[in-house]
Amino acid sequence: MVARTKLTIGAVGLAIAAVVALDITATSAPTAPAGPTPLSAVPAEALTKVAEANGLPVTEVRRMASGAHFEVDTHQRIRSVEPVPPPQEVAEEAAGPEIPPGTDVFALHSRADSDRTIYLDFTGHSVEGTAWNDGARIDAPAFDGDGNPGEFNDAEREKVYQAFLATAEDYSSFDVDVTTEEPAADDITRDGEDDDVYGTRAVITPEDVTGCGCGGQAYVGVFNDANSHSDYQPAWAYANMDYSGKSIAEIISHETGHNVGLSHDGQGADEYYQGHENWGPIMGAGYYQPVTQWSKGEYSDATSTEDDLSIIPEHGVVTLTDDHADTADGATSLADNESGAGIVATDDDVDVFAFDHTGGPLTVTALPAPYAANLDIRLVIRDASGAEVASVDPPVARVNDDEATGLDAGFAQDLAAGTYTLSVEGVGFGDPAVNGYSGYASIGAYTLTAHSG
């Protein structure tokens, strides 16, 4: 058991979803409500001013106003107010990865050298003087499942670990450190345009401390705000031990997704799309799908076609530069039985490795992230002349709400001695309109091993 100081205020509530904040102050007709008021109640003529106040396209604000889960407050920002799912809709929990021996789950980092941070705060947090609750003090209790506020038991620590893995995978193609270790205040707050070290705090707590009657809240598009960054901290993710680690991560990634400028992915009259077959969008409600990804609305009757992977970098979380060559020229050498690793950062990214095979059986294994992977791998083997020996992309099948098979790729065959190239790329599966997904956001971390003999 790991002792941790927790704020004790009780533990209540379920969580799912997202919030974003925007406030309206109209200085001339048509006037807008002072707030908090449903965005849908704002006169159509006033939405232009709302858009200007938030740096959003007016078409996007109009789309947000067509739903029932955004409101305007008194701080010139928009926030969403998500419905809490009934208990029977909570995702079926599957066994997730265990914590490796010796691992401190409160010192995890996905990219420790990054200047951007997403801090997953499970230990309780107090805020005051911010835009939340008009500056009144808010005391959020720690994530807790056993009523013991003084320490995290093994089950609680496991949820922290799994939520970290899944959130880190969602942001793995971006230059940002997802961490459970509390950073210095300066690593979160941004003080002006010249401050290049900043981020956001996501508070994971079982209690609806903002009184929204919802499952989470976060301001939209404020991750890189240079003028009043601290006013819009933190993001809130309301979750308890009834959620799997993946479901907790879905809330975190959804809420911090609002921070980096994203709105909701719905379908038809539904503001939140729950997905189809094995897939769902992060900015929808993909809690019940084993594969969740960023989206650009390729499914049928999508309410939003915003390009998530372009919008996120516009708000300070830039896409990683390519870590491995895309062709045989400059391919990364891979030694026998040693593991190579990389990130497929974009739909166009292909990572190429070179392997000297001694002849006989050649075995190659490409694995995505070990938990809640976003990357569906295609593995291609070519000989020294560039001729394709094999292309491996197994079908994807659901195991449960948290896991799917077929995201990995493996090869085993007798081949002549020589140098072979092994290519890893992200691909889609099925028809993205109705039962699958494209390669658009089939991105993320992987490991690659090869063995002769």
Which sequence ranges carry the predicted segments?
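Low-complexity, Pro/Thr/Ser/Gly/Ala-rich linker/spacer regions in secreted
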Residues: 33, 95-96, 100-103, 316-326, ...
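Acidic/polar, solvent-exposed loop segments in beta-strand-rich repeat domains
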Residues: 131-153, 292-297, 372-373, 430-441
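Secretory targeting and sorting signals
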Residues: 1-29
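Active-site-proximal segment of zinc-dependent metalloprotease catalytic domains
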Residues: 112-116, 123, 130-272
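Residue-level recognition of alpha-helix boundary/capping or hinge positions
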Residues: 245, 249, 253-255, 260, ...
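Primarily auto-inhibitory N-terminal propeptides
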Residues: 19-146
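Acidic, Ser/Thr/Pro-rich low-complexity intrinsically disordered segments
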Residues: 128, 341-452
